[in-house]
């Protein structure tokens, strides 16, 4: 077993940093406090790891998420004990929902004070048990390198997810020898990566019989970096592709086989195809309720093959006729390696293409700036190549529907948990991880006010993201549901008074603009070409709805607001 032993003893905090460095980690996001002072003292003179100081622990977690989601690398965050750790809970839960590889260090009171209601003590191991892939509390300083190495392995392998390491203050201050081994010995944790060969053959056998096959591409395609294989498989067998929200970008929106995003705010063609298919091949998708609608009627006439790296997801919501446990990339490679089977989807492709082309995207209006048009214009200005980050709400769905995605990991959003406040810090994390890429953030006036303090980072760390606020002076998605299902009673969803967002941005040293003229908006958005941190507020109508929409509990074919060409 390979080991590295340094001559001089190190304290626990130095062990943390040395181990992270050995594991190739060079960036962490954090916020100091009493229980992590030894760790921050070690950071002061440590070379090789960059620390980004957030402005709130939730922001630090979302920054780490944006870093991880946009790259596939591990995101790392450090917070203190008690309120610092509890402030991080939302980010940890968000990462768990979306399978984001995170390593979160939480400070803890000294071992002698644990369980005695010490100042700033919280049982973070107990609190995070349901929302982490695994968690640790370090009891001995010498265990730090092993625990971190295991934690990184767990967070980044199999189905990725967050791992918490609770670090008592005295453990981080005591000295010991630094003995590091890159090897991990976890007999009880052995994720299945290679699918069963017989199950792969069953998929192809069923495909040869299918007249109306559909590929459903989820976020697992991005995590496995399997977009190339997905496209090759779809093209070989001429299978139309539907994506989940997190699967956006796994196939280019311009690809003739792409039908759109499926589900509650999915496209007409995608939802009808999922309803009428006779064979669905789902890859890296967990069939959440926003995608399936009524699970009893979802793909009701179809045989279903479900490929997922997490066996717990298979059969949990939609029964699988052909269950396949394994890595999405490996599964697709095995499907492609098999002899090509004969299938004929010509009539099916003709039908779904007709469905795709018969729908109008949205009604063009002259008197108001339309959010759809803003997103389309930004797609043109960025050549469809920007990393798009969103907060949560109507703007999130419009960004999913109207930006021309081309690549995996191009859309960074909060899918499973739907966390308002995700946007600003996640965009910061994405830009720090991808300094050469354009990062565009779409955010609403509601979500922006939850974490806008992170805007302080933009000039301090030279992070030139472009913040596009689509301001409808309300909690737009809440208001939309109230108008649709609560007889228009917009209870507490309309903001009668707002801060001056221009002055707020300027207070953080960020150049700001406000646009509200539909006649000039196309030219106005040219300012995005400037490579500086930028805040653009675009006034849009309060009346705009995200369409189509499948009401909660209804089947996917029961869409509201579909508009057809005359």
Residue ranges of each PLM-predicted region?
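Thiamine diphosphate
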Residues: 119-120, 314-317, 323-325, 329-333, ...
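Well-ordered beta-strand positions enriched in small/hydrophobic/aromatic, beta-favoring residues
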Residues: 75-77, 165, 388, 411, ...
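N-terminal alpha/beta PP-like core and its mobile active-site loop of ThDP/TPP-dependent enzymes
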Residues: 2-341, 377, 381-384, 464-467, ...
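A general structural motif
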Residues: 57, 116-117, 190-202, 262-266, ...
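Phosphate/pyrophosphate-binding active-site segments
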Residues: 2-7, 142, 301-394, 503, ...
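Generic enzyme active-site microenvironment
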Residues: 164, 306, 389, 442-443
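Active-site diphosphate/adenylate-binding microenvironment
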Residues: 13-17, 21-26, 39-43, 353-430, ...
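Active-site nucleophile and cofactor-binding loops and adjacent substrate-binding regions
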Residues: 31-33, 52-62, 77-84, 139-140, ...
């Amino acid at each position: 077993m390979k080991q590295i032993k340094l001559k001089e003893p190190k304290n626990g905090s130095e062990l943390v940093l040395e181990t992270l460095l050995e594991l190739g980690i060079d960036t962490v996001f954090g916020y100091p406090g009493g229980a992590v002072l030894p760790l921050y003292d070690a950071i002061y003179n440590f070379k090789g790891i960059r620390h980004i100081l957030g402005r709130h622990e939730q922001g630090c977690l979302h920054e780490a998420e944006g870093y991880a989601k946009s790259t596939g690398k591990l995101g790392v965050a450090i917070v203190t004990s008690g309120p610092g750790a509890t402030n991080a809970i939302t980010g940890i839960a968000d990462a768990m929902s979306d399978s984001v590889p995170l390593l979160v260090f939480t400070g803890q009171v000294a071992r002698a004070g644990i369980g005695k209601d010490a100042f700033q003590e919280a049982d973070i191991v107990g609190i995070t048990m349901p929302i982490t892939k695994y968690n640790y509390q370090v009891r001995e300083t010498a265990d730090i390198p092993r625990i971190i190495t295991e934690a990184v392995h767990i967070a980044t392998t199999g189905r990725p997810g967050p791992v918490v390491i609770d670090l008592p203050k005295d453990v981080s201050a005591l000295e010991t020898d630094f003995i590091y081994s890159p090897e991990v010995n976890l007999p009880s944790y052995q994720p299945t990566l290679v699918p069963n060969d017989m199950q792969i053959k069953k998929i192809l056998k069923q495909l040869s019989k299918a007249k109306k096959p559909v590929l459903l591409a989820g976020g697992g395609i991005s995590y496995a970096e399997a977009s190339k294989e997905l496209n090759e498989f779809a093209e070989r067998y001429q299978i139309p592709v539907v994506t989940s929200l997190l699967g956006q970008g796994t196939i280019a929106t311009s690809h003739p086989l792409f039908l759109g995003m499926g589900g509650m705010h999915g496209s007409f063609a995608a939802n009808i195809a999922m309803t009428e298919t006779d064979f669905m091949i789902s890859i890296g998708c967990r069939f959440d309720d926003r995608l399936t609608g009524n699970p009893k009627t979802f793909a009701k006439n179809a045989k279903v093959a479900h490929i997922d790296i997490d066996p717990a997801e298979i059969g949990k919501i939609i029964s699988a006729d052909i269950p396949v446990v394994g890595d999405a990339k490996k599964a697709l490679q095995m499907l492609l390696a098999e002899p090509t089977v004969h299938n004929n989807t010509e009539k099916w492709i003709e039908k779904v293409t007709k469905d795709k082309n018969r729908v109008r995207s949205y009604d063009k209006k002259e008197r108001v700036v339309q959010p759809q048009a803003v997103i389309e214009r930004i797609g043109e200005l960025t050549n469809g190549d920007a990393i798009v980050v969103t907060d949560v709400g109507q703007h999130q769905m419009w960004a999913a529907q109207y930006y021309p995605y081309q690549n995996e990991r191009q859309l960074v959003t909060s899918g499973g948990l739907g966390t308002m406040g995700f946007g600003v810090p996640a965009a910061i994390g994405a830009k720090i991880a991808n300094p050469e890429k354009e990062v565009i953030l779409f955010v609403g006036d509601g979500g922006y006010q939850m974490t806008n303090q992170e805007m302080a980072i933009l000039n301090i760390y030279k992070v030139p993201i472009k913040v596009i606020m689509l301001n409808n002076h309300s909690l737009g998605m809440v208001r939309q549901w109230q108008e649709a299902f609560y007889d228009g009673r917009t209870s507490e969803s309309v903001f009668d008074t707002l801060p001056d967002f221009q002055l707020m941005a300027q207070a953080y040293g960020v150049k700001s603009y406000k646009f509200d003229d539909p006649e000039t908006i196309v030219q106005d958005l040219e300012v995005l070409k400037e490579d500086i941190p930028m805040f653009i507020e675009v006034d849009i109508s309060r009346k705009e709805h995200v369409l189509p929409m499948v009401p909660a509990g209804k089947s996917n074919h029961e869409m509201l607001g579909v508009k057809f060409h005359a």
